[in-house]
Amino acid sequence: MRVRDFSHTGITVSNFNRAVQFYWDVFGCPLVGVADTPSPRVKSFFGVAADAPSCKIGWIRVPGGATLEIFEFQPQQQPSAGPWNRVGLTHISFNVRNTQRWHDHLVAKGVEIVSKPEKSPRGHTFFFVKDFDGNLIELMDLGYMYHVLKWLGPLGGWIFRRGIYKNYYR
């Protein structure tokens, strides 16, 4: 069995409305759904130990089909940053065209820039920014490889699984 495609990434945010506005103003990603989670569910499913916890959930549509699922909990815990070699998620990434133009756009929007656009050894360009809560976001221009991966990705996966990467499969 195989998954069909990538669905979503969940991010806990400090301010629901600010997150909606940020992802719309900065990246053009609209809010497409909102739900309020009942207190008993916040306690049992999310494990928030408080008298009357709440959770607002929103779905922000990213061009291409994936979604950012945002959560605002009450009460909140303070964010904690970890080093990249910590096991777990490190960042989200958006495919873009022209990373320098995106860099300039985000500087003008006042977004915290972590790194300037640079070229990888494989030829794509990328840079990192942070959202208002400090979540790391990569913007990457894969160049021609975007189309190669989109259209030939399944074939490449089949070939590589049987070829140069076969030792990773049992």
What residue spans do the PLM features occupy?
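Short amphipathic alpha-helical segments
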Residues: 5-9, 88-90
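Core segments of cupin and vicinal oxygen chelate
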Residues: 12-64
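Vicinal oxygen chelate
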Residues: 14-17, 33, 62-68, 72-136, ...
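A short acidic/small-residue loop/turn micro-motif
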Residues: 39, 75, 121, 143-146
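A short, acidic/glycine-rich surface segment
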Residues: 40-45, 76-81, 148
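A short, polar/charged loop-to-alpha-helix boundary motif
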Residues: 144-159
